[in-house]
Structures are given as structure tokens and as C-alpha cells.
């Protein structure tokens, strides 16, 4: 079997999918297709894989190709030294990790100046070889004397033996089987320790207190503790080290090298093993293990952030509602923005209900007037500084209204970042930064996805140690999440911002800008075909993006569905077969006829796959289908709660704001989000909080404890 097929077989085995489908995915990716396009429109070829599975195949294929490239390079480099044996070549070819390849290459690597290379240059290698024969006679002194040479700067017997020991120490360190065993045993039996560092006195809030005298088995340490220790070490507050099972390792090395034989050089070899392990092996293995722990912890933190972001982006929109956005503040006043059902800003204002200005009565009347004048249906209050005081003020105004108006506390993380951005300046050139924040808060309630894509995903406030992980990997992962969600939901090409359009499959930032420019020139697009005229939107880009772009009330009714234009001919043939037309999309009559359809036979008749036909039928019956409709709506509120009102055992409803390794933070309407520790999430064992809760979930909780002094609330989801 050729190498490429073997690699594809390996990926299929790793992720538990059929080789045929894995090969199709790789072929589609190499042909320049995007992940969302493959997931949505090539289901027959992929066996209906989702975006995550396709992305996993893409990443594994990339890794395996890089691994193979390195294998070829290492084989070539060793062959150039005339040291490549069949056995070594086979070992390199069979390696499944980059680390294994590097271990095998280590003895042949061109080394910089080391104690061993210096000793070799002095001609001491034969003496090292002699010691490794484990001689029983006591001829070492006489043998070593033969290597004394002023010319080679070996002046004494001791220097000759010392040089030979350095050569042996490096040979031990370079032996791949030893390294592999030591790495595994250190992982299995070693511990990770932390202690107070030089700057421990700067840890005023005792954030790292639990790590001042801390030790835990490497095999059991959880990702968030690794990240905490890494951060503490970076800030010089902690010292972190790996404590290996040193005696166990040295005993193993003695057994491998001295082989329990009686020899006159036992003591010398024991000293050499000690030196090799302490000076060469242990520091390198410690670095490797710390790196591996950090990489795993990074991946976990990125996974949590990505999952939280996905849930946040999938929050359901409040369609067709006029919203008053409130950006709370004390001294500078609360900024107000009224946004109509299309997101158009109708009114901008400011009120000063709090200290030090205290114009509460005037503010009360102003808000009341705005609510009436613009027929506001919802109030969105940002959850930053002065949020709870503003919530109390708004509740008092709402009580004074003749009709019922609800309010929602909106997570405003990143709103200030957006407000000061170039994008916000372009969108609202006449508004001040904080006025833009109020608009952003209102629109976050109306359409969270459209608003959140304008912000750097790292600023949305749902991460865990996100500033400590690999920023490149984090950015890649978060971009993938945003792209996946945007394409799953679909985009109205006549209302979407360039910020939203740039995440549509195949569209770059500049092409998204060209789409908006063209729209502004012509007023609006009347069908999908018109997008072919956009500069730099070529045939391949059009194929990738067009199914995710919707044209509402255009000249072609199919353009408002998720059906790809490549299937329009078959779709119209299907409608004709049913005695209907595109005018019947979304009607009960069409739904009834499709329900009676023999899918398998119809697919054969139309010359398309059964899965594609199923998707077409779904779009014809529910063209407005939005995956966000399944998600619970935000918690609507009419009254306010104080920290002092909380009593142990009290039952409350709350919104999950963040999920981390050790639990979930829930907004229950008081100043501080309460923590549900992982042990209080369920009656059953919970491996990870994400198995039970997600960002945006509405949950029932019970108050477990309140610390008014520290402003901390402990919650439980177990009654």
C-alpha cells in the first residue's frame, strides 16, 4: 500500500471513521474546498461528517505530512554520515510521534561543543569503549595511561578517565530506548512541585496561596492547575519543578549498562550514570514533560473557550423587538440607545441617576418618556460597573409603566473594545465611544451573533487562562468556531455587515468589504447571481460561499433557502413532480406532499443522493430554520435581587455566564456571579462541567453559601 493511503488509513483508525470518507475529505480539502462547504454540501462523499470531524482530519493530515517530511529529512541526514542501518531506518519509518523521530536522530545530530565532543577530539573514545566492555581485571589505570598526551592536552590519568566518562554519559543520554523509558516512568511515578518564588510577597490577594507548598503526581495534575502554576512561575511568584523517581531511574540504567555483572569499573560507571542522568537527561526530560503538560493544558483551555464561545454565538436573537440599550456608569452617566427591530439607531441619550450627580427623578422621567415614545419592548442592561444600581433604577421605572416591559442583563464583555475600534468608528462616526457601547449592548440582545462577530473573540469574556495559552492556536480555534456558527446560521446578504460576511465560507475580509460596497452602490441584491459581478469573487469563491448567503424577497424564491444553486435544477424538478412551484416554499401544502415522498426512489429519479434530497426537502419546508431557535431564550426579568437578600437553600433561576474546569459561574441577578463547583453540578460523577452545562443555559440553582464581605456566592445545582 502506498504511503499516502497508509496515512489515510491511520487517520481513519485514530478517529474511528471509514477510510473511504476520510480519503474523500482529504481530496475535497486539497481541491480548495472550505470546511463549512464540505460539511453542508458534500455529505454523500463524507458520510455526513460535521465541521469538527472534518477539521480534525485536516489537522491530523497536516501533522502526519509534517511528520513524514521530518522522517525523510532525518533518514537523509543519517545516510549522509554513512550510519544508516536497515534497523534504524525501519524504526524511524515506524515512529508515530515527532518526539520518537527526534530521539532516534539525537545520537547522529551534529552537536555543538560539549564535554563529550571535546573528549572525542582528544582521542578518548577507545578508552570509553574499553570501559563499556565491563573489564573484570584491574587494567584501567594502565589503559588510561596510554592516552596521556601533551599534544592532545590530556595531562593525567584522571583527565583521561574523566573524558571517557563524559563520552559514555552522552552515549547514555542519546540512547532512544533509555529516553523513552525514562520519560514514561517520570510521567507515571514523578510529581510536579511548586513553592513560593522571589516575588511571592506581591501576591497580595493570595491568588497562588495553595501553590506555595504544593505537590501532585504528574499523571493526575489537571489542566487548570498546570496553567495556574505556569502563570505563577511567569510572574516569579512560584517556583515550579518536576520531582522524578531518580533512584528508580538510576537503578534501571545500571541494570541496562552494568547488567548485574562483576566488573572493576562498576564505581566509575555508577558515577557516569549519575552524571548522565543529572546533567543531561533529567533537565531535558523535565523540559519535555513541562512542555507536554502545558500543551495539553493549552488544548483544554482552548477547547473550553471554543465551546463557551460557540454557545454564546448561538444565543437566540430577539427578533422584531425594539430595544433600549443601557451602558451603566456612575460619574459619567448611563448611556442610552434605542435600536429598532432592524438594528437602526433611533435615539441616543444620557442620564445621571447615581452618585455623585444623583439626578434620579430627572433620569426616571427621561427613560419613561423614551420607553413610551419609541414603544420599547425590552431593556438591555450591560453587566459592567454600576450594573446592579442601574438595574434597580430601571426596575423602578418599569414599575411605573402602564404596560409590562421586561429587562435582560447582557454580558457586555468586549463592548468597550468594539466601541473604540476602527470598525465602530466607521459604523457610527458621529457617536462617542460610550454611546456606541450602548448601541452594542442593545444589539447584542437583538442579534448576538451579528454583534459579537465585530469583537475579537478573545474579548468576549468566556475563557479560562486565555492570555497564557498559545495565541496562534487560540486564534485559529476561535476563528474556526465563529466560521462554523456563522455558516450554520446563514447570512442575509442584504443586511449583514462586512464583519459578519468575512466569516462566510470562502470570503476574505477584502471580498466581504467588496460585497458591502456593491450593495451600497445598487441598493440591494435581488438574487444570488448578482454576487458573481463582485470584484475578486471568482467561480471557486462563489461556489463556496453562495449557499450560506440568503437573499430575502428577491427574484428567485430559492435564494432565501440554504439550498445551493448547484441543486436548483433538481429542486425545481422535485417541485414540478409534486405539482407545485417555488411560490409554495414553506407552505403546509408543500410540507404534506414532501411527507408522503418516497425518498430513495425520488433521489434516484432526480439523479442526486438521498442525503442531499433530505436536506433540500428540509429547506423547502422550513426555509427560515435557524439552529438558534432550539436554544432557550435569555432570562427575562421584572425585579431585582441584592446579595443581602440571599439565604442558604434559596431556589433561584440563573444564566450560565462562564464554564471552567472546576465549575460554572452563574448570573443569579446579584452583583457577583455565583460559582457552582464541579462537585455540586449533579448527583452523578461529572468528568467535566461542559458535560452538564453550557454558556447561556438557564439553570435552577440553590444558594449554598454567601460571603457578603468578599462578595462571594456558592451555588449548587443539586437540591
Curated annotation (Swiss-Prot):
Any GO MF annotation of the entry: mRNA binding
Domain of life: Bacteria
Annotated Gene3D superfamilies: Nucleic acid-binding proteins (2.40.50.140), RuvA domain 2-like (1.10.10.650), Tex N-terminal region-like (1.10.3500.10), Tex RuvX-like domain-like (1.10.150.310), YqgF/RNase H-like domain (3.30.420.140)
One annotated GO biological process: nucleobase-containing compound metabolic process
Coiled-coil regions listed in the entry: 64-100
All copies of domain S1 motif, residue ranges: 649-718
Keyword terms of this UniProt record: Coiled coil
Name of one Pfam family that matches: Tex_YqgF
Protein name per UniProt: Uncharacterized protein YdcI
Organism: Bacillus subtilis (strain 168)
Amino acid at each position: 500500500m502506498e504511503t499516502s493511503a497508509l496515512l489515510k488509513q491511520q487517520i481513519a483508525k485514530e478517529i474511528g471513521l471509514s477510510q473511504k470518507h476520510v480519503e474523500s475529505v482529504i481530496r475535497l480539502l486539497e481541491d480548495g474546498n472550505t470546511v463549512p462547504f464540505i460539511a453542508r454540501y458534500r455529505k454523500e462523499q463524507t458520510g455526513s461528517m460535521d465541521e469538527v470531524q472534518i477539521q480534525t482530519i485536516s489537522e491530523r493530515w497536516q501533522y502526519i505530512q509534517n511528520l513524514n517530511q521530518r522522517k525523510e529529512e532525518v533518514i537523509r541526514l543519517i545516510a549522509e554520515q554513512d550510519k544508516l542501518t536497515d534497523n534504524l531506518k525501519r524504526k524511524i519509518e515506524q515512529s508515530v510521534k515527532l518526539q520518537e523521530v527526534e530521539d532516534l536522530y539525537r545520537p547522529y545530530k551534529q552537536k555543538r561543543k560539549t564535554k563529550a565532543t571535546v573528549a572525542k577530539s582528544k582521542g578518548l573514545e577507545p578508552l570509553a569503549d574499553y570501559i563499556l566492555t565491563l573489564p573484570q581485571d584491574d587494567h584501567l589505570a594502565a589503559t588510561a595511561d596510554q592516552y596521556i598526551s601533551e599534544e592532545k592536552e590530556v595531562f593525567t590519568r584522571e583527565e583521561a578517565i574523566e573524558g571517557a566518562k563524559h563520552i559514555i554519559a552522552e552515549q547514555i543520554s542519546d540512547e532512544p530506548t533509555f529516553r523513552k523509558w525514562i520519560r514514561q516512568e517520570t510521567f507515571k511515578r514523578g510529581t510536579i512541585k511548586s513553592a513560593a518564588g522571589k516575588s511571592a510577597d506581591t501576591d497580595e490577594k493570595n491568588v497562588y496561596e495553595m501553590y506555595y507548598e504544593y505537590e501532585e503526581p504528574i499523571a493526575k495534575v489537571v489542566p487548570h492547575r498546570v496553567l495556574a502554576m505556569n502563570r505563577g512561575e511567569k510572574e516569579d511568584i512560584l517556583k515550579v519543578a518536576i520531582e522524578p523517581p531518580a533512584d528508580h531511574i538510576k537503578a534501571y540504567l545500571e541494570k541496562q549498562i552494568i547488567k548485574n555483572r562483576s566488573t572493576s569499573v562498576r564505581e566509575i560507571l555508577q558515577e557516569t550514570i549519575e552524571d548522565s542522568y543529572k546533567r543531561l537527561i533529567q533537565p531535558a526530560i523535565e523540559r519535555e514533560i513541562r512542555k507536554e503538560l502545558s500543551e495539553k493544558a493549552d488544548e483544554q483551555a482552548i477547547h473550553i473557550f471554543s465551546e463557551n464561545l460557540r454557545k454564546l454565538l448561538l444565543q437566540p436573537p430577539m427578533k422584531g423587538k425594539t430595544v433600549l440599550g443601557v451602558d451603566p456608569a456612575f460619574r459619567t452617566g448611563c448611556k442610552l440607545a434605542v435600536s429598532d427591530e432592524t438594528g437602526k439607531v433611533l435615539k441616543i441619550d444620557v442620564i445621571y441617576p447615581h452618585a455623585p450627580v444623583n439626578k434620579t427623578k430627572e433620569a426616571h422621567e427621561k427613560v419613561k418618556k423614551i420607553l413610551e415614545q419609541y414603544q420599547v419592548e425590552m431593556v438591555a442592561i450591560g453587566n459592567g460597573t454600576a450594573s446592579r444600581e442601574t438595574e434597580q433604577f430601571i426596575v423602578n421605572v418599569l414599575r411605573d409603566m402602564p404596560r409590562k416591559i421586561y429587562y435582560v442583563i447582557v454580558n457586555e464583555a468586549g463592548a468597550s473594545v468594539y466601541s473604540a475600534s476602527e470598525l465602530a468608528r466607521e459604523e457610527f462616526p458621529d457617536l462617542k465611544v460610550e454611546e456606541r457601547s450602548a448601541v452594542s449592548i442593545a444589539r447584542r440582545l437583538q442579534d448576538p451573533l451579528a454583534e459579537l462577530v465585530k469583537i475579537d473573540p478573545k474579548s468576549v469574556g468566556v475563557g479560562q487562562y486565555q492570555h497564557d495559552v498559545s495565541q496562534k492556536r487560540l486564534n485559529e480555534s476561535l476563528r474556526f468556531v465563529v466560521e462554523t456558527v456563522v455558516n450554520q446560521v446563514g447570512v442575509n446578504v442584504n443586511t449583514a455587515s462586512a464583519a459578519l460576511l468575512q466569516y462566510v465560507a470562502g470570503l476574505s475580509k477584502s471580498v466581504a468589504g467588496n460585497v458591502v460596497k456593491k450593495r451600497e452602490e445598487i441598493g440591494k441584491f435581488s438574487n444570488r447571481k448578482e454576487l458573481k459581478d463582485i470584484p475578486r469573487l471568482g467561480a471557486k469563491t462563489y461556489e463556496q460561499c453562495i449557499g450560506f448567503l440568503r437573499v430575502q424577497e428577491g427574484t428567485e424564491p430559492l435564494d432565501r433557502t440554504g439550498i445551493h444553486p448547484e441543486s436548483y435544477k433538481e429542486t425545481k424538478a422535485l417541485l414540478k413532480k409534486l405539482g407545485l412551484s417555488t411560490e409554495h416554499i414553506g407552505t403546509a401544502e408543500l410540507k404534506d406532499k414532501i411527507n408522503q415522498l418516497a425518498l430513495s426512489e425520488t433521489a434516484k429519479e432526480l439523479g442526486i443522493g438521498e442525503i442531499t434530497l433530505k436536506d433540500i426537502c428540509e429547506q423547502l419546508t422550513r426555509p427560515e430554520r435557524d439552529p438558534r431557535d432550539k436554544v432557550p431564550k435569555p432570562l427575562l426579568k421584572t425585579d431585582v435581587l441584592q446579595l443581602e437578600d440571599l439565604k442558604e437553600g434559596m431556589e433561584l433561576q440563573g444564566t450560565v455566564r462562564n464554564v471552567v474546569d472546576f465549575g460554572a459561574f452563574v448570573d443569579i441577578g446579584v452583583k457577583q456571579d455565583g460559582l457552582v463547583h464541579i462537585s455540586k453540578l449533579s448527583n452523578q460523577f461529572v468528568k467535566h462541567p461542559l458535560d452538564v452545562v453550557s454558556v447561556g443555559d438557564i439553570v435552577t440553582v440553590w444558594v449554598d453559601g454567601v460571603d457578603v464581605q468578599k462578595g462571594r456566592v456558592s451555588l449548587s445545582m443539586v437540591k
